[in-house]
Amino acid sequence: MRRYPAVAGQFYPEGDALIEMLSSFFKDLGEEGTKRTITAGVAPHAGYVFSGFTASRTYKAIYEDGLPEVFVIFGPNHTGLGSPIALYPEGEWITPMGSIKVDSKFAKEIVKRSGIADLDDLAHKYEHSIEVQLPFIQYIAEKAGVEVKIVPITLGIQDEEVSRSLGRSIFEASTSLGRDTIIIASTDFMHYGSFYGYVPFRGRPEELPNMVRDWDMRIIRRILDFDLDGMFSEIREMNHTMCGPGGVGAGIIYSRLMKAKEAELLHYTTSFEVSRSPDAIVGYASIIMKR
């Protein structure tokens, strides 16, 4: 089974242009690490011109800490297709950078242990949130000279129960199978403006990015404290438009079980820095959790 690119040439470039863009993001890449303390990372999934540098900070940190065997990648299901909790079952994903294999045994073990997820490829067919993470992973894996595998998971249902179930199931499955694993939670933060039908505050255009950041930081602080319930409480209180809290929550639970003690915000920006549009502002953050 092969999953071909759905958004190459749209969210990110193809061919030499992709390599050039990734190289520019990673021009400050340090030496490959061997500590392997990172348990989970958060990265955005907008077009690379908006959020690519922010996403690269997560993968730079992983490269300099040490690569895992498997990346379990969560992404919100924007298309509504397929199962509401869907793990890609087997085969490989194709990108302009080449192919990357799915750890089918790991995926099946997570489904078996969770009791709430399905093996389903349809949910992934056109979804961009996981696809845009892969060139970053392929780039650092090639730099390290290693082959890594992935377990892609799309979420159409995102709440504390789903996060707890999947975070624990990934921990149990990875322990049972002996998989060295990092969770990647693909998410953007606030989607502000008339374009998104979400205008909880108003201000001059130049003021809005800082206002968006202030609201996003209420959630980010909870993530940095490994506070799953607090994160969802803040989201509900603000009616916040963060699109991937379920994957972040699973990363929090998994990291707790892995005895992670520290989380760090590596980079934050908004789409306004590029678009200058006050009618559609999205927040982007790079976060890591580590032992």
UniProtKB/Swiss-Prot annotation:
Annotated family: Belongs to the MEMO1 family.
Organism domain of life: Archaea
UniProt-listed HAMAP family: MEMO1
Protein name: MEMO1 family protein PH1626
Classification of source organism: Archaea, Methanobacteriati, Methanobacteriota, Thermococci, Thermococcales
Annotated source species: Pyrococcus horikoshii (strain ATCC 700860 / DSM 12428 / JCM 9974 / NBRC 100139 / OT-3)
UniProt cross-references to InterPro entries, sorted A to Z: MEMO1_fam
